[in-house]
Each structure stands twice: as C-alpha cells, then as structure tokens.
C-alpha cells in the first residue's frame, strides 16, 4: 500500500508525513472573533512548525433545534474567509450542505468538507467533486470504516481523487459516540490521508435536550490516542470562552491552552513516525 499525498500549496498531507492541523472555530460567530482566533492559531502553529489550515462553518445546517444559531450564511461567511486568507496567508476549509454552495465556496476555500450526515448524498458528492477542490469526507457515525470505500468511489467516478478521510466517532447507543482506533487504521489501508476530528468525537449528540453535549475534559486523552496511530492530520476546534460558544462549546478546546495542547500532539506524531514499521500479520 502506498500513501497518497495531497498537495495543498507547500503543505503535503499524507499518513506518513508530519501531521497537518485543521483547526479554528466551529461556526463563524462574528468577523472580529474569527480574525482573533485565526491569528492565535497562525501564531501558535508557526511557532511550533505545524502545517495549518483554518476551519470554520458559515452555516450549521444540522443543529438540533430550529432556534439554534446557524451562522452568518454563505455570502457573509465567504467575505470573512477571504479576509482571513488575505490577512494571515492561510489555506481554508469549510463545509457545504447544498449543491448550489459548492462552486462559489470552492472559489474561496481550498478544501471543502462533506458533512457526516450527508456523506451518502450522491448529488452533493458529484457537485463537490466537479469543483476540483480537495475534499474532506467526514465518516458518518452510522457507517463502518470499510464502507468509506463507496464514498471514495463516488468521488473518483465523478472525477476527483483529491480526498481526505476524517474520523469523528461512531454511534454507541443513544446520545453517545465512541472512537474505533482500529477503524482509523482500517481507513488508512485505503492509502488516502486520514485525519482525526478529536473535537466532534467528544460529542454527546442530543445530550442537552435541544443541543449536543460534550466531554471537553477528555480532549487531550482522545487526541493523544489518535495521534499515536500515525495520521495525516488532526482536526480541532477552540474558543476563547467555550461555555458561551454559539455551537459545540462543550467540545471546544479553551483557546488559551492551544499551544501546550499542540506541543504534546506534535511530540507524539514525531515519535510515532520515527519508528520502523512492524508487520505483525506475518
């Protein structure tokens, strides 16, 4: 098995390369907050030598409640993304939920994300593929790791092979997710880059009646475990005031802890990727 390399400017995304951070905030709450969070991430990742892609959503279309905050919308969100890209010279990732969003979003961001709940929607997959952008596929909570090959095939047959696979936990009864570490290794066998969304894997879906709960206190333990697999990247969201974040605050890393958190993740990644592979199947 050879590891596919996704080239994003000077950044190489692959399972055997130094990990890439996909990080930022869950949803765009305001222009000023987005700029502040992007600046912190940019400074910390540059200091630590970690390749970095800024992440935020312009619309959270799958909130538990119709009254929950969704975001500024595509038009305003893309303006904020353009300013972040220009100011900090950062590549960008965001998610799309509808076919008509794909082309305009791909004109601004570098990676477009297929949400886990929509990963089997063929029309959306085809529209995303046709943009030619790099695609980050969130593994649905209800699919087995080996079933990701069907989504890969859809993208391939629609003309796009620039695919990243993202683990975000699997349903485990009601209102709970668990992370199958062997499942991530199974996805790596495809050769495509695999990243670990350690933020959303902490969710307790529907755990707060009208919104998702989370287990922020275990953010470090879960991410350490994932990084020990030797992955292409880590996906995390942070917030300066998680308890008052407009979406997924219970899962968000406190922004002031970002540097120490990433120091540990980089140390694990460097160590694991310095090892010689051991084939225990023989």
UniProtKB/Swiss-Prot annotation:
GO terms for molecular function: 3-deoxy-8-phosphooctulonate synthase activity. It comes from the Bacteria. Keywords: Cytoplasm, Lipopolysaccharide biosynthesis, Transferase. Pathway: Carbohydrate biosynthesis; 3-deoxy-D-manno-octulosonate biosynthesis; 3-deoxy-D-manno-octulosonate from D-ribulose 5-phosphate: step 2/3; Bacterial outer membrane biogenesis; lipopolysaccharide biosynthesis. InterPro entries: Aldolase_TIM, DAHP1/KDSA, KDO8P_synthase. It catalyses: D-arabinose 5-phosphate + phosphoenolpyruvate + H2O = 3-deoxy-alpha-D-manno-2-octulosonate-8-phosphate + phosphate. The keyword Cytoplasm applies. It is found in: Cytoplasm. GO terms for cellular component: cytoplasm. Disulfide bonds: none annotated. Its EC number is 2.5.1.55. Coiled coil: none annotated. GO terms for biological process: keto-3-deoxy-D-manno-octulosonic acid biosynthetic process. PANTHER family: PHOSPHO-2-DEHYDRO-3-DEOXYHEPTONATE ALDOLASE. Belongs to the KdsA family. HAMAP family: KDO8P_synth. NCBIfam families: KDO8P_synth (TIGR01362), PRK05198.1 (NF003543), PRK12457.1 (NF009109). This is 2-dehydro-3-deoxyphosphooctonate aldolase. It comes from Shewanella baltica (strain OS155 / ATCC BAA-1091).
């Amino acid at each position: 098995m050879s590891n596919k390399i996704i080239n994003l400017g000077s950044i190489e995304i692959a399972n055997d390369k130094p990990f890439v951070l996909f990080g930022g905030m869950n949803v765009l709450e305001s222009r000023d907050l987005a700029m502040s969070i992007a600046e912190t991430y940019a400074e910390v990742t540059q200091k630590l030598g970690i390749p970095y892609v800024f992440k935020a959503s312009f619309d959270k279309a799958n909130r538990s409640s119709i009254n929950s905050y969704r975001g500024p919308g595509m038009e305003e969100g893309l303006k904020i993304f353009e300013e972040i890209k220009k100011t900090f010279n950062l590549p960008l990732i965001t998610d799309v939920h509808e076919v008509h969003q794909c082309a305009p979003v791909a004109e601004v961001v570098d990676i477009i994300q297929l949400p886990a709940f929509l990963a089997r929607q063929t029309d959306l997959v085809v529209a995303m593929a046709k943009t030619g952008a790099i695609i980050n596929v969130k593994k649905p909570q209800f699919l087995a790791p080996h079933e990701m090959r069907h989504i890969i095939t859809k993208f391939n047959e629609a003309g796009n092979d620039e695919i990243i696979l993202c683990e975000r936990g699997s349903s485990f009864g009601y209102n709970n997710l668990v992370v199958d570490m062997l499942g991530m290794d199974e996805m790596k066998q495809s050769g495509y880059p695999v990243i670990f969304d350690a933020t959303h894997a902490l969710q307790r879906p529907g755990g707060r009646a009208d919104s998702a709960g989370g287990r922020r206190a275990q953010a470090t333990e879960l991410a350490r475990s994932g990084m020990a697999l030797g992955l292409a990247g880590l996906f995390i969201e942070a917030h300066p005031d998680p308890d008052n974040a407009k979406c997924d605050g219970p899962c968000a890393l406190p922004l002031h802890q970002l540097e120490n958190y990433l120091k540990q993740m980089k140390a694990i990644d460097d160590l694991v990727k310095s090892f010689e592979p051991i084939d225990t199947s023989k």
